[in-house]
Amino acid sequence: MRTPDAQMRAGHIPAHLIPDGTDPRTVVVVHHQAEARDWTGPILLALVAAGGSVGVVMTLCLLLQTAATTATALAAAAPAGVGLSISLKARKGK
């Protein structure tokens, strides 16, 4: 305990802080307590993160639904001749 602050935290009273003529046994050390923590920031951060996650999941679901609808429409239209077909005939001999 080299600093007065460390001595105060340990409950020791540095001699230079006691006024002359005071009985050290009657001195009371009052420790300062930290103020109550403000939880607004962490709670707001958690809500924004949860909302962002829900937004990402909803966007992915919408994208998947659009892709499935497009694939269904293409599969229904393929037998109607929308696709191109190429037939290759190989020549036998000269």
UniProtKB/Swiss-Prot annotation:
It comes from the Bacteria. It is a single-pass membrane protein. GO terms for cellular component: plasma membrane. Keywords: Cell membrane, Membrane, Plasmid, Transmembrane, Transmembrane helix. The keyword Aminoacyl-tRNA synthetase does not apply. Involved in plasmid transfer. This is Protein SpdA. It comes from Streptomyces lividans. The gene is spdA.
